[in-house]
């Protein structure tokens, strides 16, 4: 039966793809690690530097608005959200984590565009530092794979 099913294989070729990145500046060292890993992976996947737009914002709560603006422009095949929310001693962590995550997801669904979410939510700086390189690269791969899948499915 599987032989009769049309299977769409993952496509990690970034050639010709336009990628928009919204990056929070709060927790700067972690965000820079995410950014550097994401850009390095996009380059490995064949995305040209001139096809990448990077916009920075104050914090994670501002990321969805910039993603929405990028999505509305119609200039991008996929978007990437980068940021770091590290738990403190107040309820603010939950608020920022939940709202930024929901906003990022909503942009993708509302504007029919793939969005890779690499806004880290961690208990401490050490966890963020361990995850930043892996998750930055993951976000790049997700953006490229989903952009290609999206194009294939849309015909």
Curated annotation (Swiss-Prot):
Binding residue positions for 5-amino-6-(D-ribitylamino)uracil: 26, 60-62, 84-86, 117
GO biological process entries: riboflavin biosynthetic process
UniProt EC number: 2.5.1.78
Keywords from the UniProt entry: Riboflavin biosynthesis, Transferase
GO CC terms of this entry: cytosol; riboflavin synthase complex
Alphabetical list of Pfam families matching this protein: DMRL_synthase (PF00885)
Known catalytic reactions: (2S)-2-hydroxy-3-oxobutyl phosphate + 5-amino-6-(D-ribitylamino)uracil = 6,7-dimethyl-8-(1-D-ribityl)lumazine + phosphate + 2 H2O + H(+)
Residue positions of the active site: 92 (proton donor)
Enzyme class: transferase
UniProt binding sites for (2S)-2-hydroxy-3-oxobutyl phosphate: 89-90, 131
GO molecular function: 6,7-dimethyl-8-ribityllumazine synthase activity
Annotated SUPFAM superfamilies: Lumazine synthase
PANTHER family per UniProt: 6,7-DIMETHYL-8-RIBITYLLUMAZINE SYNTHASE, 6,7-DIMETHYL-8-RIBITYLLUMAZINE SYNTHASE DMRL SYNTHASE LUMAZINE SYNTHASE
The family this protein is said to belong to: Belongs to the DMRL synthase family.
Role this protein plays: Catalyzes the formation of 6,7-dimethyl-8-ribityllumazine by condensation of 5-amino-6-(D-ribitylamino)uracil with 3,4-dihydroxy-2-butanone 4-phosphate. This is the penultimate step in the biosynthesis of riboflavin.
Name of this chain's protein: 6,7-dimethyl-8-ribityllumazine synthase
Species of provenance: Chromobacterium violaceum (strain ATCC 12472 / DSM 30191 / JCM 1249 / CCUG 213 / NBRC 12614 / NCIMB 9131 / NCTC 9757 / MK)
Organism classification: Bacteria, Pseudomonadati, Pseudomonadota, Betaproteobacteria, Neisseriales
Annotated gene: ribH
